[in-house]
């Protein structure tokens, strides 16, 4: 069999058949996914906040449901079978290489297999069982949580939206005392309030290890913050939007970790799912491209954090950590760690023996607004993670595993180039590489679609696309996968050719059309640190933290 397209390229009926069968297949996949998102009308509620919370609970049940696991597994197998059928029907067996460079090109097909380890780890999430829910979910706990937002201070609109989203959600899901810390490089015009502290990093501030960028700001915050050592810190970016399910997930995680701490264990560091649909209407293409990140959260990263072992890095946003654990490892990571300070810090925490965990709920953020920022964002990640692998004070095995993932990231990008080139050469492909590549591709199709499903299903009903528009998004999600893969590869190749030398900050708008991901609440309120809910209880709202199937 052959993965090239020389036969179809010379016979237009083959191309038409390929496109037609592909579209029918994609529509079928979209309908299957849409079927899982339909909610019974009898569960509809009248109050916006309760309706949003119940919708969250149903999504949680869907993701945890055994049938949904089988649906995703079926999508992987079904997609692979369809690929094999299309190859057998539309393509010839390919030709053998005649020149040395053709033999070299043929061997490049094995690069398809480079993504197999990451795909396998992601697939492990299908067999992991979610932890049991605590019996006292919803009970108010007297543990202060500080939402720490780090920004350059240039986008006041985004900061204002983030602060408002925290207050809106905490006014409804009042599960713990809270405060907000905004860490900026310049003065910002945020209205003073009892629940808000603005920390301005002095322009002449220098850390002992010469850390830069966000690492410098975080180190300053840990030095001057007045948080109690047993308080908790939730890290988010300037455009982050907190949701109801996330507040519940934070509450559950803090309660569980405080129980472990009382038994003599070190509280673990938590992370969860991030959605990127805030600008779906304004920037649908790049939002679809970031469906992979959400799908990766609920698969590969879920496997990592549920196992408690750090092996593929950590996001810089959605980090939940107790203050004394956070300050035990300095964010003064030096120039080498300043590009991806989050992962550098996390690997040093792992070296100290600190464990990791999954946190229910999701944080809403936005995708890059243009192709240049998209590629440069990926370049920063790739360059920074290599510095982590080379310089982080972590165990050798942990650094080697990270190097393996980073090498596979590059090689899989090369495999994408091979696919394009072989469209014109028509070389035969070794069947093991073909089978492995087909399975990897099928897994990524499922990951993209699952990420999109979760993102759309978590949007409030009034902002969610119509059934027809959603169907179009699912079809576009798969049809544009070669484009998305090229964008991801461009970031990696850019990192190899011109490694990140600074800290590229992508442009983010202020107010977004996406609004709150899981509610339509308009009321704004705040809870001052140390205040207590009546009778020690949260408001009587039937909610549940949003989870993935493995969290």
PLM region spans:
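Juxtamembrane C-terminal module of membrane proteins
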Residues: 27-68, 79-87, 106-144, 168, ...
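Acidic donor-binding loop at a coil-to-helix junction in glycosyltransferase catalytic cores
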Residues: 337-345
């Amino acid at each position: 069999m052959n993965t090239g397209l020389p036969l179809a390229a010379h016979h237009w009926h083959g191309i038409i058949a390929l496109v037609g069968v592909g579209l029918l297949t994609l529509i079928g996949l979209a309908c299957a996914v849409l079927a899982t998102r339909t909610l019974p009308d009898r569960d509809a509620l009248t109050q916006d906040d309760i309706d949003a919370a119940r919708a969250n609970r149903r999504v949680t049940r869907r993701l945890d449901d055994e049938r949904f696991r089988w649906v995703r597994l079926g999508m992987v197998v079904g997609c692979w079978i369809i690929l094999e059928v299309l190859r057998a029907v539309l393509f010839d067996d390919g030709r053998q290489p005649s020149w040395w460079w053709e033999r070299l090109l043929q061997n490049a097909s094995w690069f398809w297999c480079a993504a197999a380890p990451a795909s396998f780890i992601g697939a492990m999430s299908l067999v992991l069982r979610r932890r049991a829910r605590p019996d006292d979910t919803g009970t108010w706990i007297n543990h202060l949580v500080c939402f720490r937002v780090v920004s350059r201070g240039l986008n006041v609109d985004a900061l204002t939206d983030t602060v408002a989203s925290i207050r809106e959600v905490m006014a409804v899901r009042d599960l713990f005392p809270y405060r907000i810390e905004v860490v900026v490089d310049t003065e910002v015009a945020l209205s003073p309030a009892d629940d808000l502290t603005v920390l301005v990093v002095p322009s002449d501030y220098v850390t002992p290890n010469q850390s830069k960028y966000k690492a410098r700001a975080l180190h300053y915050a840990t030095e001057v913050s007045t948080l109690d050592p047993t308080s908790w810190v939730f890290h988010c970016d300037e455009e982050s939007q907190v949701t109801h399910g996330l507040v519940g997930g934070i509450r559950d995680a803090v309660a569980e970790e405080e129980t472990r701490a009382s038994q003599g264990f070190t509280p673990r560091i938590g992370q969860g799912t991030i959605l990127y649909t805030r600008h779906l209407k304004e920037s649908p293409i790049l939002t679809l491209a970031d469906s992979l990140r959400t799908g990766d959260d609920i698969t590969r990263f879920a496997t990592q954090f549920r196992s408690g072992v750090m092996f593929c890095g950590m996001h810089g946003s959605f980090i939940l950590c107790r203050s004394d654990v956070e300050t035990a490892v300095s964010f003064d990571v030096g120039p080498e760690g300043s590009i991806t300070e989050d992962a550098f810090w996390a690997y040093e925490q792992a070296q100290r023996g600190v464990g990791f965990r999954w946190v229910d709920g999701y944080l809403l953020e936005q995708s890059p607004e243009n192709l240049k920022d998209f590629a440069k964002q990926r370049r920063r990640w790739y360059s920074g993670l290599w510095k982590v692998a080379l310089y982080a004070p972590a165990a050798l095995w942990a650094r080697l595993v990270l190097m393996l993932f980073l090498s596979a990231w590059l090689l899989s990008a090369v495999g994408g180039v091979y696919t394009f080139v072989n469209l014109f050469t028509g070389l035969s492909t070794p069947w093991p590489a073909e089978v492995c590549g087909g399975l990897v591709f099928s897994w990524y199709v499922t990951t993209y679609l699952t990420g999109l499903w979760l993102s759309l299903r978590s949007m409030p009903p009034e902002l969610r696309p119509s059934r027809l528009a959603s169907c179009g998004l699912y079809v576009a999600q798969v049809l544009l996968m070669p484009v998305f893969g090229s964008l991801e590869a461009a970031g990696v190749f850019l990192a190899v050719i011109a490694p990140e030398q600074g800290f590229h900050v992508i442009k983010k708008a202020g107010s977004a059309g996406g609004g709150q991901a899981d509610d339509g609440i308009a009321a704004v309120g705040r809870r001052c640190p140390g205040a207590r809910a009546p009778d020690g209880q949260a408001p009587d709202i039937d909610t549940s933290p949003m989870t993935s199937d493995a969290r």
